[in-house]
Amino acid sequence: MSNARRLNDGMGAYVANQTIKCMNKKGVMVKNARILILGITFKENCPDIRNTKVVDIYHTLEEYTHRITVYDPWADKDHVMHEYGIDVTNELPEEKYDAVILAVAHREFAGLDVKGLVKENGVVYDVKGFLDRDLVDGRL
């Protein structure tokens, strides 16, 4: 396997672990934390879930907590459940999270108040460099 492929295959775990590090730095209890992942599709503004690396982020986070919500207005939730066994919501939950990971830069996320989605010392991690730097605790 090529080095580029190996690097790409490890990116999901890397993102999850970087988010966990940000949470630890801010004193957020990781065990049983509530985490919101924004987006699960392979790319933005598209319903295709084939080859998505967001699944790897999800499964790495499961080592720490099972309180993970995936919100994606583009994904077919039945298809995601069938392919990956992950429950996806197409409606943004009105809850506060310990961490929010912007994984896919859907246009619906452009006007989203991400700071309003996290608890007082919650973490925002931006995988796509989509959000204003002042709003995020970490980015890829």
Residue ranges with predicted function:
Residues 1-140:
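Structural/interface elements that position substrates and couple domains in central-metabolism enzymes
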